[in-house]
Amino acid sequence: MAAIRKKLVIVGDGACGKTCLLIVFSKDQFPEVYVPTVFENYVADIEVDGKQVELALWDTAGQEDYDRLRPLSYPDTDVILMCFSIDSPDSLENIPEKWTPEVKHFCPNIPIILVGNKKTAGDEHTRRELAKMKQEPVKPDDAKEMGSRIKAFGYLECSAKTKEGVREVFELASRAALQAKKTKSKSPCLLL
């Protein structure tokens, strides 16, 4: 049985865990050193609901310097992973401020999975550091509410470091991409 090919693009603030999530899923190893992404591609196979799916994983740079380069990733996208870091409330604020408008402009009608990365970041040390800035880790209810607000296909939390929830993120993304094909034929991602 031939694999069904789907393109997944991951977006979100710089250093929110996008690359780690992709590397842990595709290579089953956690990168210990942070290297800012410019543009990377990975391929991974996954079976969902009895179907073999070959996911082309397109990593993107979250930093503002790449705002003009990032749209080159969007054509022919089947599903978007829109990420924030649970230990960075600011990265959640950027979901409706920056990422949703950008994605909905270039990829109208493409399903979005909202992903809370760094699930294990709710530890005591992180809480203390955030408290110094009068902040706290993102609460699951706040993230779910954000998912509803941006009309995401779903919301999941994961930890690339412990691998908790990683496979579920890509299973849900694959399901979203497979369902979307029925309605997508007239509305592919656009590059304007």
UniProtKB/Swiss-Prot annotation:
Compartmental location: Cell membrane
Xref: SMART domains: RAB (SM00175), RAS (SM00173), RHO (SM00174)
UniProt GO molecular function: GTP binding; GTPase activity
Coarse class of the protein's main subcellular location: membrane
Motif (Effector region): 34-42
Annotated binding of GTP, by residue: 12-19, 59-63, 117-120
Modified residues (Cysteine methyl ester): C189
Pfam families given in the database record: Ras
Listed PROSITE patterns: RHO
Protein's UniProt name: Ras-like GTP-binding protein O-RHO
Topology in membrane: Lipid-anchor
Keywords: Cell membrane, GTP-binding, Lipoprotein, Membrane, Methylation, Nucleotide-binding, Prenylation
Residues making up the propeptide: 190-192
InterPro entries: P-loop_NTPase, Small_GTP-bd, Small_GTPase, Small_GTPase_Rho
GO CC annotations, alphabetized: plasma membrane
